[in-house]
């Protein structure tokens, strides 16, 4: 299957999707191939030089594992192209809160899954340790995290992330999956446990309120709900990533 990051040019300054599509249309499928066969493309001299320089730099930065280089240059909607290259340094992230506004509400829980282990960080217990854990990774995967999870975390800890961030909501919508995370899970044939089936975001707020009033079982249910959220993010991208690539290449035709 085509490696989308190694076939990306749109992150190079002043190179747009039209030029990228032209390169793909010529059958060039990776940066090394471009360096060998760029002469088959009819390009203005300045643009050719810009592409050659950008491709050489991209090869070097990818070889050194510099995720920040791509996080800063890839459009937000296309960060998913980096998924495979930074898969081993990925954290799947989901938060629970008391409401929708980072300024007026609080994070109650942060769930982080690295593909092997899930860690849960809870307000009043260990919430501040989540920032150290997130610092171990180069790539974050969320659902609606660009508008919700990351702004909340950045406000909570007064930080700015430099990770590659794949907000699955956008590439999923492009391949036909719209609506909330739970609706998309159903569309993909995924099921929740009996304890968490049917729980909504509003229910999660209520569970936290019950916990604050002394109900420890409510906290356990909230942890399980949050854990299923982050674990399912990995399942979703594994199931849909090939279709994201297929759709991207189809769009250029």
Which role does the model predict for each range below?
Residues 1-87:
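N-terminal accessory regions of nucleic-acid-interacting proteins
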Residues 21, 150-151, 234:
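Alpha-helical elements of the RecA-like P-loop NTPase motor core of helicases
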Residues 27, 157, 240:
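Active-site catalytic pocket residues across diverse enzymes, especially alpha/beta-hydrolases
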Residues 71-139:
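Conserved RNase H-like, two-metal-ion catalytic cores of nucleic-acid enzymes
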Residues 94-96, 149, 167, 229:
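Acidic active-site catalytic centers that drive phospho-/nucleotidyl reactions
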Residues 104-105, 153-155, 238:
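Short amphipathic alpha-helical segments
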Residues 109-194:
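Conserved DEDDh/DEDDy metal-dependent 3′-5′ exonuclease domain
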Residues 189-253:
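Acidic, Mg2+-coordinating catalytic module of metal-dependent nucleases/exonucleases
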